[in-house]
């Protein structure tokens, strides 16, 4: 589960190496977010001379978690890192290519169609 002040790693190729969550969408007293939830992040580490500078506030969607999640068939799924995809508008990713695994829960919630073949 993702809480406020959690360090996350973006998996889209936009030159950002590390971000930190500071707002979770879905209610004023929300404490935790899971896969396919939106959050507001701040950029902490970037590549030099990048078009996304440090301290930029962006919207993101969670794609993988370290915490294990129970699937519909009863099995569990777990990833090594907490990853997000940085967004430009509602559902368009900032980078062109997504690197690494993505949870199948996004396919069930129909987010994959908005990423237009990059997953």
From Swiss-Prot:
Offer a single GO CC term for the protein.
Answer: mitochondrion
What Gene3D superfamilies is this protein classified in? Answer: Ribosomal protein L14 (2.40.150.20)
Q: Which UniProt keywords apply?
A: Mitochondrion, Ribonucleoprotein, Ribosomal protein
SUPFAM superfamilies the record matches: Ribosomal protein L14 (SSF50193)
One GO biological process from the UniProt record? translation
Molecular function in Gene Ontology: large ribosomal subunit rRNA binding; structural constituent of ribosome
Main localization, broad class: mitochondrion
Matching PROSITE patterns, A to Z?
RIBOSOMAL_L14 (PS00049)
Similarity section: Belongs to the universal ribosomal protein uL14 family.
This protein's name: Large ribosomal subunit protein uL14m
Source organism: Tetrahymena pyriformis
